[in-house]
């Protein structure tokens, strides 16, 4: 039987169910076999206990038995030797609800102390190598705010998977072999001529931004008018390479300033230089997935569930972007990645079935490629929409947003919604030093705790360890709620890793910070009661650890003073 392990209490309750099922099988009450996993979830309302499982309902079809009867059978075989349960209840069609003894909750703080900055880590992905490819914007201009959201989503997914034991490789795919690159070179070439006094008609397909004029000016300053006497085709190649090189270096620097560093920048050109596309097409043809129609090569993606077959080589003999994309993914698997995660703009949703067809044709499972879609960002200033682009077509850049609101606020705000939902980003709110600003609200909780710990030290109070506190003193509802929330952190990380949903971490942080601020405003941590002071200091120290661990996952700092 597969067991889904999260936090300590969750694991113990899961084992309780597993052992009860084994007992039922041993007595012939249930038939043996491959049982479904035991899923144990923390309840949203304590009226229904602290944890609940729907295992009996999932088992009903397997056992061909009424789910409530299965639930009763399993419950009657619970052997709670550790005495962690106050009681269990069967609810609805067959849920089993678990009520944990109050004194057990405080014991969970020991795990936080002993694991420290590793609290929340897991070994789920041990031995598995995962590549996360994200941003991958053409080097034709600065990264804009849409790229910024995808950059944070990809980076934090990589962090979460790394904390879950996976070996992570971050990669940026440089689309530098298509018509857009040629248009970049033409754009700079035309501006260069303009700067030298020539009258040039500027096509609509060319890039209009001021950065194009700046690059042309750099070339003019360096080379003078020497390029006017050169062949236009060779000029465009030179201007393309020169501009792409400058833009890519600026992209790398902007990403670094945003806290994002890639393990590899993979050039699309490598696929052609190393015959990657040609080898892919030969491989697909050998497997019978290619056919020719009117001098066009088609890939039979419908064999793998796509709604129509796709062109991989045009009539002019040029491979399509799709062919290059499959070749690139073939290269990924050849480099030994067990799984590949791509972060795409939501407008690429229709591209997923053909990519799944491509990797299946190469002999890989559909599950070996997971795609996370990132929706658009609506930029606001005090609730009013901000123009996302100028008349010349320049978008608000990632650098402009990060420079205005700061790295921490930008990263946190981009993760305030599910990645596949539209996001409103208010620049003024993100700059406020108040509870209206979500990242300030969370960071202030951490800074507040640091202030409490400094005050204790100034008063000569030694910061306690679990051995010299009295956890049974932590019994008021606010303290139990805080401990339960702290206990939930490993489950949140596990859930985020499984679903590739980094917003779960920000939601969790908002909850934890809210509970702490409310507790702080209502109760004194440092008081005349020495035992209570030590115990509450230990509690807030644990809260500090979890806040910092969660913020670190998001690539956001945990300031000690604010």
Swiss-Prot record:
GO terms for biological process: arginyl-tRNA aminoacylation. One of its GO terms (molecular function) is ATP binding. The keyword Protein biosynthesis applies. It comes from Syntrophus aciditrophicus (strain SB). This is Arginine--tRNA ligase. SUPFAM superfamilies: Anticodon-binding domain of a subclass of class I aminoacyl-tRNA synthetases, Arginyl-tRNA synthetase (ArgRS), N-terminal 'additional' domain, Nucleotidylyl transferase. It is found in: Cytoplasm. GO terms for cellular component: cytoplasm. Transmembrane segments: none annotated. A motif ('HIGH' region) lies at residues 137-147. The gene is argS. Gene3D superfamilies: Arginyl tRNA synthetase N-terminal domain (3.30.1360.70), HUPs (3.40.50.620), Isoleucyl-tRNA Synthetase, Domain 1 (1.10.730.10). It catalyses: tRNA(Arg) + L-arginine + ATP = L-arginyl-tRNA(Arg) + AMP + diphosphate. Belongs to the class-I aminoacyl-tRNA synthetase family. The keyword Translocase does not apply. Keywords: Aminoacyl-tRNA synthetase, ATP-binding, Cytoplasm, Ligase, Nucleotide-binding, Protein biosynthesis. Its EC number is 6.1.1.19.
